[in-house]
A protein has these predicted regions:
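Bacterial N-terminal signal peptides that target proteins for export
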Residues: 1-8
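Pyridoxal 5′-phosphate
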Residues: 9, 13
């Protein structure tokens, strides 16, 4: 009798899990329809490295050393080595003629921006406009008849709703992750100022390379 009860308990528990799983959303259609309008962004900019006496001293303590023992600032090394720095991010197309959105920090100060589409085509992009406080940048590529995404409104979005992100974390292009809306109306400190755009907080997995990618509600 004891064995029978244990089997009955396990069977009911498994059935309960099956019923709950039927209520989980299916993201396949959204991923298939939306992924073509999501892009991978590679930006390159040049930074300068100052080397002192070829030894790579950049510690302020060496400045204090020269001031104390020689009575003058440490002489600067005229040699400056510049090197390219490459960063990656995501974005999404908002018009068939090549306008797209991303985060400003993905392309800020970039000398060159390359956009990679889902069909493996690549284009050089131009920054049309950017706003550092809201961290949004508008880019343009020379292409036609592109797949697009429509910008939605978050007014009716509720905490606890399912959301999906598509992007290129760690350069793993067009990856889909899901989660829920954790909170609305968040602001992010920006030095002495606070960002004036209310952000959504979500538990969707966001990693380096996801920046600038779209977040979808169902």
């Amino acid at each position: 009798m004891f064995e029978y009860k244990r089997f009955l308990f396990v069977a009911i528990f498994a059935l309960s899990g099956f019923v709950q799983s039927k209520d989980l959303p299916n993201f396949t259609e959204l991923a298939e329809e939306s992924s073509p309008a999501v892009v991978n962004i590679t930006s390159t900019k040049t930074v300068s490295n100052r080397n002192s006496f070829g030894g790579g001293f950049g510690d302020p303590r060496y400045d204090e050393f020269f001031e104390r023992f020689f009575g003058q600032p440490r002489p600067s090394d005229p040699r400056q080595n510049s090197r390219p720095v490459v960063s990656t991010g995501s974005g999404f197309i908002i018009s068939k003629d090549g306008f797209l959105l991303t985060n400003n920090h993905v392309v800020e100060g970039a000398d060159e921006i390359t956009i990679s589409l889902g069909d493996r085509r690549e284009f050089k992009a131009e920054v049309i406009g950017a706003d550092a406080r809201s961290d949004v940048a508008l880019l343009k590529i020379d292409a036609k008849n592109l797949p697009t995404l429509r910008i939605g409104s978050s007014k009716e979005l509720k905490v606890g709703e399912w959301v999906v992100a598509i992007g290129s974390p760690f350069q793993l292009r067009f990856s889909v992750t899901s989660g829920i809306v954790s909170a609305k109306g968040r602001s992010i400190p920006n030095g002495s100022d606070s960002t004036y755009v209310p952000f959504l907080q979500t538990d969707v997995a966001i990693n380096p390379g996801n920046s600038g990618g779209p977040l979808f509600n169902l």
